[in-house]
């Protein structure tokens, strides 16, 4: 957090000088690929979190029901982030597992709140937001952390990723996108789309997706607007020619020449 604070402050002080900056996106897709952590410092922070919540070990033991299956703690150092039990693959204590989820959410919200407070010092009337709907994160508390609203990343084509066991045509697998748009609106009545799918996608090792059919980009954009999005931006503008996201196509192809997707976007503008 020390380095996070320094970097955020330097960036805010530098870029808030420019009138062309209309707002700030904090981080990117917090808790996306990884939302569980097990380093030494994470275990220590989890103990500190529990001490603040429960005060004493006796109180924690009572609230967590640790007397069941001989889990009673006699020292704070005996507590770790939830571990697998010796009985099958489940977590031994569901109450401690819930506290772990609360701890992870608390850590992420605190991390974003720190950045928001620093940016706000010099942001003026610029908006502050973050993007994505992911696990182990209490978005109601996130909305109270200093952001003005949240953004959603809309990738309907994920439903048909070629490496999914149930991939392929049919079965309306993309309806999850409608659900997530409705969920985003419930969390943040004012919201936007930070990343609207702009073409075929995929990393170099997974989630490969076919090219959208003619009219699908326009359809997906209107889907976001129909669900209440006040802002739509596309990911990405120009297809990257290197790196893990080399197959994640933008509105522009590798050639940077006019193409069907750009023509379709012009129809969206006309709409």
Tell me what each language-model feature is:
Residues 1-149, 153-174, 237:
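Polysaccharide-binding and catalytic clefts of secreted carbohydrate-active enzymes
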